[in-house]
Amino acid sequence: IIASLHNKTSYFKEVSEDKFKSIYEDIKSNISYLSNYYNTLYEIGFNEVYASPSNYIFMRNYFKINAALEYANSELDNWYSLVTNETKIRVCLIHNNLELNHLLNNKLISWDNYMIDTPVIDIVKLYKNEWKNINFSEILERYIYKFPLLDYEKKLLFILISMPPQIKKSNNEFEKCKVISEVMDYVFKTEELIRPYNTKQEEEK
C-alpha cells in the first residue's frame, strides 16, 4: 500500500543548493546531541560507586549505542557527498504518521499529517512506531522491490533509523531496566536490519 502510494504520486522537484545542506546540518546536530546525551549518561554511570541494575545494563551495552551513532555520523558524511551535485529531489505524497493502527481493511486512514516530501519519512516513522511489532526486514524488502529507493534515499533511511531513541526517564528501577533494555533491543534489531544492505553494497564496490 505504501509503495503503491509513493509510486503513484512521486515526482522530482528542483531544490536549491541549500536544501541538502540544511538536511545534513539538522541530522548532524541531532547525532551530536544524542552522542553528548549518551556520553553524559556513561560518565554519570562510570562514577557510580555501586552500579544499579539499570546502570549495569547501560554500561555493558554503551559501546553498541556509540557504534550506532558513529555509523550514522559516518554515513551522513557519505550521504552528503552523494547529494552535493544533485539539483532535484524525489518527493511524493506521504502519510507522515504511519503505524499499524492507521491501516484498516487494506486502506490508510488518519491523514491529518499528510504532506509532500521524501518517501523516506514514511518508512522511518513506520519503523520507529512498529519495530517491536512486525518483521520489518520483510516489509522493507517488499517495499524496495515495488518502489526502488535511490542510493541517497536508502542511505538517508538507514542513517535516520540507526539513531537510537533517548532513554525515557523513570524513578522506578524496574522500569529503568525495562526502558534501557528496549533501547538496546532497538539498536540490535536495527543493526540486523541494515547489515544485509551494507554487505551487498560492499560486495558491489
Give, region by region, the residue ranges found by the protein language model.
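Conserved kinase catalytic-core helix
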Residues: 1-30, 144
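Gram-positive cell-envelope targeting signals
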Residues: 3-6, 49-55, 65, 86, ...
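Regulatory N- and C-terminal appendages and interdomain linkers associated
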Residues: 59-81, 181-205
